[in-house]
């Protein structure tokens, strides 16, 4: 139960929950685009993604100066269920719709 509790602890933060939803819908995405989507500075998004990475929820890939993140493969039935729910259940949430709209217009500089 410790691993499951740790997942919920990480996702209890609204910013990290929004990041999980965006990554479940959009797939691999650059930090700068995620920052634009959430109207937050890059360093704040990077910090949240670092916490999520430490918990095994996301993976990172460097491309030059850019860091790209995607959801990790689910390690348990719980994680698989949550990933599906993020993409299906929360995609129509008002906040997520606004995030997706900003994400579609985001442009790394």
Segments predicted by a language model, with ranges:
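Alpha-helical residues within the helix-turn-helix
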Residues: 36, 53-54
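A general structural signal for well-ordered secondary-structure junctions
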Residues: 14-17, 29, 58, 96, ...
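Amphipathic alpha-helical dimerization/coiled-coil segments
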Residues: 2, 76-109
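Beta-hairpin "wing" of winged helix-turn-helix
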Residues: 54-63, 70-71
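Short, hydrophobic-biased segments on the C-terminal half of alpha helices
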Residues: 49-50
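N-terminal helix-turn-helix DNA-binding core of bacterial DNA-binding proteins
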Residues: 2-43, 66-76
């Amino acid at each position: 139960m410790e691993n499951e509790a740790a997942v919920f602890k990480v996702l209890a933060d609204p910013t990290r929950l929004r990041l999980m939803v965006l990554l479940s819908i959009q797939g691999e995405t650059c930090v700068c685009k995620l920052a634009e989507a959430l109207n937050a500075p890059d360093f704040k998004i990077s910090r949240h993604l670092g916490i999520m990475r430490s918990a095994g929820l996301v993976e990172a890939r460097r491309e030059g100066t850019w860091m790209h993140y995607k959801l990790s493969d689910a390690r348990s039935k719980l994680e698989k269920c949550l990933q599906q729910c993020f993409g299906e259940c929360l995609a129509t949430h008002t906040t997520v719709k606004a995030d997706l709209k900003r994400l579609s217009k985001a442009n790394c500089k």
